[in-house]
Structures are given as structure tokens and as C-alpha cells.
């Protein structure tokens, strides 16, 4: 075959250049991103940063007692170097763009969270925002961003930026009222997200819980901050509220009583703390199914049985449905209500004989504080309980000693909208930025248990 024929065949099978503008734009953006020619401003900042690193390292002594405490010097919500770096990486979030020019704006950009990585050098004062700027950043995220966008839209952005705020407080070892203020608002954000986004695709409830409860995370840090404030004889207005959340997030932990021993007396006198401790005691049960399955999240529901407990589920649901429990408390209780309902059904099973009539569906709704018929139907199906119908309406539930109850492995499999009954008519931004004790605001008269619960007659 001649050379000319081969060249013609190559040209024939050669793909034609794409006329799609989007493709050309993507290629141009990719070329700009991986170009070796950096922006002049970024180059200047990079050189300045290198000099700052050398100066900072020279000041640090090998003796930790003489080492200087890191104090942030960044006066904006986002450090200048990070902003220029993210511009080159095309990592600017749409919320950080100027609405007119569509360019990154220094007053709209917020520092993103970065994991500490080897080879990046020490954290510099210019990378860290002081407490006053961190407080302004939190106000911007919760009072502006969450007021402008829905929680579903803004959750990922706010979650990432608040992690960066906590990181800046941590590297400065800041134990101040500004730190308390910021951590309290961040805690409310995660608590509300647990409930509001529970059924949103790609939302991880487990990750949200870890941000609240794991060692060195939000509620743990708040506990340390409160303890430090007590040593300084300073008062924290919302301490009782968040101590109550600590208890409610640990309903499945039998060691909560030990953690409360260090709390001051005035905290125990607050109604919100009394209510949370009462709910904790009533939530304990002794009919857990002992299992070694790794699929069960023990951070939510303990598999340990509590000795000498009376399985007082009716009292638990009466208190939980009352005005004594606020919306945010209800958001946390939603995590445990499915497990407590499982314990209630197992306890009721032992009390009723097959010779008796079946439990009326409406009565069981009141006993288990189900917010709708569909919720109770789903609960019964998840536990393998048979429901009797009159026409299309559920009339009774078959539950007696002969009934076999299937205990769901994951409580998240059961839909629970317990907190919806307590949700106030206000937006998420207002709920997060309460100016007074959350235990006394946003109470809604309960629809359930207006009358004494009907107990099945034998």
C-alpha cells in the first residue's frame, strides 16, 4: 500500500474537532487550571508566604514552654492566599461569586475546611482568623446564607465552612465567649439538619451525629468550654440547653450519669435539663436483642440492657409529646423513638393473650405517639406485625404472646417525624440564632395526649 493511500485513510478515520462550545470551554478551563504560568498576584503571595513560613519557624523554640501561642491575623472571612489559590483551581463556590461580575469577591468568600497534610508546612497566623472574625463569619453563614437559601441547598457549604471555623478556634486554643457562641450555633445547625434532611439523598445522618458527639467534636468541645468558664466565674446563658442536648444524644449510653457529676448545681435546676434526664431514665429498657452484627450503629442505640428498668414507654411518650420538649429536643429524640417503640412493642407483647381482642389501631397510635397512620403502618410492617383493616382503614394490630416481632437492624430504616409536631412557624436561620434560652421558646401545644391515653381493657 502506497504512502499516500495510508495518509488518506488516517485522515478519513481521524475524528473531527468538536464544534460544541461547552467542550471548548472545558478544554480552555482545563488548560488554564493545569497551566504552568501562574497568576502574578498568586506568585507574589506565594513568595510572601514562603518568607512568612521561614520567619514563623524561626520564632518557634524546641522548648514548648517558650513557643509562642498562635494568634490569627486574618481580618477577612477567607485568607487572601487561599482565595487566590482557589481562583486558580476553579474551586470558588457559587455563593462566593459577585452577583454582577460573577467573579470571586473577598467579602463573600469563606475559608474552606482543609485537613492537615504533611508537606504543607506549619499553619501561619495569616491563615487563621481571630475569634472576633470567626464570630462574624458564623453570623454571615447562619444569618445571611441560611436566610437566603434553603437548608437543603446550603447545607454542604455551611457544614464545610463551619468545620473550618472550629478548626481555627482549635489551633488558637481559644476559650472565649466568642468560641462558646459559635459552637452553640453550629450545634443547633447540626441538630436541625439531623431532622430536616433525614430523608434527603446523599445526606449521611451518621456523619452528622459524629460531628456532634464524637471526641473533640462540637458538644464535647462545648462541655470543655463551659467547664473552663466555670473556673473563670463566667456565666454562659445557654449552658443548660446544650447540656440537655448532650443527655438526649446519649439515650443509649448507660454511662451518662457519670458525665453529669461534674455539672454545676444551677444546671440541674433548669427545667430543660430535668426533662432531658427524665427522658433518659424512661428510655432505658431491658429487652434489647443481644447481637454482634456490625451493621448496627451503636452510637445511636445501645445494645446493652438496663437492669431493673420498668420499660415505662407510655410515660416517655407522654413527656416527649408535651410542651416540655422543644423542637430541637424533638429533633434528637427522633433518632431514638424507633428503638423505644421497638422496646414498647416487645413489652406489650408479653402482656396480651391471643384470646383477647387485638389492639385498636388508634389506641396504639396514641401509645406510641405516632404522628400519622402511615407512620404507624410502616412501623408495624418493619416489625412484622399484622394489621387488620375495615375497608381501606386500619382498625387493629395483632399483638400478643404468640406474635413474632422482627426487630429492625437499623433504626434509620423506620421513618419518624416526631419533631414535626413541635416545629414552629419560623425559618431555620431564626431557629439557629436564638437570642434566649431555647428551653423557653418555640413551644407548641401538643396535639397528642390531650386526654389520658386509652389503655386496652382486658
Swiss-Prot record:
Residues 1-16 have a biased composition (Basic residues). Pfam families: SAC3_GANP (PF03399). One of its GO terms (cellular component) is nucleolus. Residues 1-33 are annotated as: Disordered. Residues 17-26 have a biased composition (Basic and acidic residues). The keyword Acyltransferase does not apply. Residues 211-411 form the PCI domain. It is found in: Cytoplasm; Nucleus, Nucleolus. Transmembrane segments: none annotated. GO terms for biological process: mRNA export from nucleus; poly(A)+ mRNA export from nucleus. Keywords: Cytoplasm, Nucleus. It comes from the Eukaryota. Belongs to the SAC3 family. This is SAC3 family protein 2. It comes from Schizosaccharomyces pombe (strain 972 / ATCC 24843) (Fission yeast). The lineage of its organism: Eukaryota, Fungi, Dikarya, Ascomycota, Taphrinomycotina.
Amino acid at each position: 500500500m502506497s504512502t499516500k493511500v495510508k495518509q488518506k485513510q488516517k485522515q478519513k478515520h481521524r475524528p473531527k474537532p468538536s464544534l460544541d462550545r461547552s467542550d471548548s470551554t472545558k478544554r480552555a478551563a482545563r488548560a488554564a487550571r493545569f497551566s504552568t504560568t501562574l497568576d502574578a498576584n498568586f506568585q507574589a503571595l506565594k513568595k510572601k508566604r514562603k518568607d512568612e513560613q521561614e520567619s514563623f519557624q524561626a520564632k518557634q523554640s524546641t522548648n514548648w514552654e517558650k513557643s509562642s501561642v498562635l494568634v490569627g491575623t486574618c481580618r477577612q472571612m477567607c485568607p487572601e492566599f487561599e482565595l487566590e489559590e482557589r481562583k486558580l483551581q476553579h474551586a470558588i463556590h457559587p455563593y462566593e461569586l459577585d452577583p454582577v461580575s460573577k467573579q470571586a469577591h473577598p467579602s463573600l468568600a469563606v475559608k474552606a475546611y482543609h485537613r492537615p497534610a504533611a508537606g504543607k508546612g506549619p499553619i501561619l497566623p495569616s491563615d487563621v482568623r481571630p475569634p472576633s472574625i470567626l464570630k462574624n463569619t458564623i453570623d454571615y453563614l447562619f444569618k445571611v446564607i441560611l436566610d437566603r437559601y434553603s437548608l437543603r441547598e446550603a447545607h454542604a457549604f455551611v457544614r464545610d465552612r463551619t468545620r473550618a471555623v472550629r478548626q481555627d478556634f482549635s489551633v488558637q486554643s481559644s476559650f472565649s465567649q466568642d468560641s462558646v457562641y459559635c459552637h452553640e450555633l453550629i450545634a443547633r445547625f447540626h441538630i436541625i439538619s439531623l431532622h430536616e434532611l433525614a430523608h434527603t439523598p446523599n445526606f449521611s445522618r451518621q456523619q452528622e451525629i459524629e460531628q456532634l458527639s464524637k471526641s473533640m467534636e462540637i458538644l464535647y468541645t462545648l462541655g470543655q468550654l463551659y467547664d473552663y468558664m466555670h473556673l473563670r466565674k463566667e456565666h454562659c446563658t445557654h449552658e443548660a440547653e446544650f447540656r440537655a442536648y448532650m443527655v438526649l444524644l446519649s439515650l443509649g449510653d448507660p454511662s451518662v450519669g457519670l458525665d453529669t457529676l461534674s455539672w454545676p448545681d444551677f444546671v440541674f435546676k433548669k427545667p430543660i435539663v430535668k426533662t432531658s434526664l427524665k427522658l433518659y431514665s424512661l428510655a432505658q429498657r431491658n429487652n434489647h436483642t443481644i447481637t454482634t452484627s456490625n451493621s448496627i450503629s451503636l452510637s445511636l442505640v445501645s445494645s446493652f440492657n438496663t437492669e431493673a428498668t420498668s420499660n415505662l414507654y407510655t410515660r416517655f411518650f407522654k413527656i416527649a409529646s408535651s410542651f416540655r420538649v422543644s423542637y430541637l429536643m424533638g429533633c434528637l429524640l427522633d433518632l431514638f423513638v424507633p428503638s423505644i417503640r421497638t422496646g414498647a412493642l416487645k413489652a406489650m407483647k408479653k402482656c396480651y393473650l391471643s384470646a383477647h381482642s387485638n389492639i385498636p389501631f388508634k389506641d396504639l397510635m396514641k401509645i406510641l405517639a405516632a404522628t400519622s397512620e402511615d407512620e404507624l403502618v410502616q412501623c408495624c410492617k418493619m416489625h412484622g406485625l399484622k394489621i387488620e383493616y375495615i375497608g381501606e382503614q386500619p382498625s387493629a394490630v395483632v399483638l400478643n404472646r404468640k406474635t413474632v416481632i422482627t426487630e429492625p437492624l437499623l433504626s434509620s430504616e423506620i421513618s419518624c417525624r416526631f419533631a414535626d409536631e413541635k416545629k414552629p412557624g419560623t425559618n431555620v436561620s431564626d431557629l439557629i440564632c436564638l437570642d434566649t434560652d431555647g428551653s423557653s421558646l418555640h413551644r407548641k401545644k401538643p396535639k397528642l395526649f390531650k386526654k389520658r391515653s386509652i389503655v386496652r381493657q382486658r
